[in-house]
Design a protein with these regions (language model features):
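Feature marks hydrolase-like catalytic cores characterized by long aromatic- and Gly/Pro-rich stretches
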Residues: 39-177
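Anion-binding catalytic surfaces of enzymes that hydrolyze or transfer phosphate/sulfate esters
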Residues: 1-70
Length: 177
């Protein structure tokens, strides 16, 4: 009943989506997808990137507070991620410089069942290092974390047998309590 009549206008930020997500999680839904409708793709004008990231982090804080107020934070896992990363260096010398696509990215995972920490790592050139999937710690000679290892780890974290979806993939376990 809490989401009947709720209208989410495009570009109105995360607040209406957070309200709807919490209402759905209080009901019968077991997942929700939130999209801030922001352009994080800053090939140029790098100054915009910080503004958009601050908006995103404020939204994450708002989501955490709303989940906590609804007594859902202890049973909810939050995953914030992108399909790609950005180069660690600017693509030019002007005020309009930005960052191009980069094969390494990061994810923020928090909430129920998550062991706090930093998992994975980069070398001196900022390329992804291999990791031990059991611990999430960098390990020489190991393969870098792949998307399927991460997805299998998230499934494992939320209590789903990852082998049903990724039968030949080892999930990352390091961030799981």
């Amino acid at each position: 009943d809490a989401i009947v009549g709720l209208k989410m206008a495009s570009g109105s930020g995360l607040t209406p989506q957070i309200t709807a997500a919490v209402a759905m999680l209080q009901g019968t839904s077991c997942s929700a997808y939130l999209d801030p409708h922001l352009d994080f793709d800053t090939h140029d004008t790098i100054a915009d990137q910080g503004v958009h990231q601050n908006t995103l982090f404020a939204g994450i804080s708002e989501l955490i507070a709303a989940l906590e107020a609804a007594s859902l934070l202890g049973t909810t896992t939050i995953v914030v991620m992108s399909e790609m990363g950005r180069t660690p260096k600017l693509n030019g010398n002007t005020n309009n410089a930005g960052k191009d696509h980069w094969p390494y990215t990061s994810a923020l995972v928090l909430g129920a069942g998550v062991k706090p920490g930093v998992y994975g790592g980069t070398d001196d050139q900022l390329y992804g290092r291999g990791i031990d999937l059991a611990t999430g710690k960098p390990q020489d000679g190991a393969l870098p974390l792949a998307y399927d290892n991460f997805a299998a780890g998230i499934l494992t974290l939320i209590g789903i047998d990852s082998k049903e979806w990724y039968p030949n993939v080892t999930p990352i376990q390091g961030f799981i309590v």
